[in-house]
Amino acid sequence: MEPFVSRIYFGDLLAGTDEAGRGPLAGEVVAAAVILDPAQPITGLADSKKLSEKKREALFVEIQEKALAYGIARATIEEIDELNILHASMLAMSRAVALLSIEPEYVLVDGNRIPPNLPCSAEAVVKGDARHAAISAASILAKVTRDRDIVQVAQIYPEYGFEKHKGYPTALHLEAIRLHGITPIHRRSFGPVKKILEG
């Protein structure tokens, strides 16, 4: 895939932001923002979904060690149900950018929409997690954090198998919902959950 190069911003204080967890039926949506250090390049950055769990975990540590700044934020299950998943994802990305210890001069956002309330100009990059290192780094921080969150939840609700499906609507997960009902971490606005609630 063609690497992305902004034709608007050419400086170094560029943040990438991405989210993880738009598709699952359960759990919060997690976003991250990263400003990479050009003096400390990180090899192996790619779309987090294309990397093995082991590789993601290693890069998760390296990104935090080498980045000039990073922020990780969430939108709650209540916010997802109230706003919808798209707006909740935008909110989480805005929060992640706001948590950066260095204010960016420009933000690259994975996808085709720009979150509101960013502190600077921004550009949306379709498939950005595979095309720009800063967005790739953000996608890795977001995915590893969300996966860790959901594995912790699995200890509270062991009968749902969250550690296996991470909250996605797999046959295993849907069967667990059918057998055991809805938990407080399920997104009530999502089709399969809504259907069960409506009986």
UniProtKB/Swiss-Prot annotation:
Its recorded reaction(s) are: Endonucleolytic cleavage to 5'-phosphomonoester
Query: Which positions are annotated as binding a divalent metal cation?
Result: D18, E19, D110
Top class in the EC scheme: hydrolase
A cellular component annotation (GO) from this entry: ribonuclease H2 complex
Q: Name one GO molecular function term.
A: RNA-DNA hybrid ribonuclease activity
Gene for this chain? rnhB
Kindly name one Pfam family recorded for this protein.
RNase_HII
* Gene3D superfamilies cross-referenced by the UniProt entry: Ribonuclease H-like superfamily/Ribonuclease H
Q: Which GO terms describe its biological process?
A: DNA replication, removal of RNA primer; mismatch repair
Q: What is its EC number?
A: 3.1.26.4
Q: Does the keyword field hold Manganese?
A: yes
Question: Any keyword Transmembrane helix?
Answer: no
The RNase H type-2 domain, residue ranges? 12-199
Protein name as annotated: Ribonuclease HII
Superkingdom of origin organism: Bacteria
**Co-factor binding comment:** Manganese or magnesium. Binds 1 divalent metal ion per monomer in the absence of substrate. May bind a second metal ion after substrate binding.
Q: Sorted alphabetically, which NCBIfam families does this protein's record hold?
A: PRK00015.1-1, PRK00015.1-3, PRK00015.1-4
Q: Which co-factors does it depend on?
A: Mn(2+); Mg(2+)
Query: What are the protein's UniProt keywords?
Result: Cytoplasm, Endonuclease, Hydrolase, Manganese, Metal-binding, Nuclease
Write the signal peptide boundaries: none
* Stretches that traverse the bilayer: none
Q: What does this protein do?
A: Endonuclease that specifically degrades the RNA of RNA-DNA hybrids.
Q: Which family does it belong to?
A: Belongs to the RNase HII family.
Tell me the compartments it is located in.
Answer: Cytoplasm
Q: Which organism is it from?
A: Marinomonas sp. (strain MWYL1)
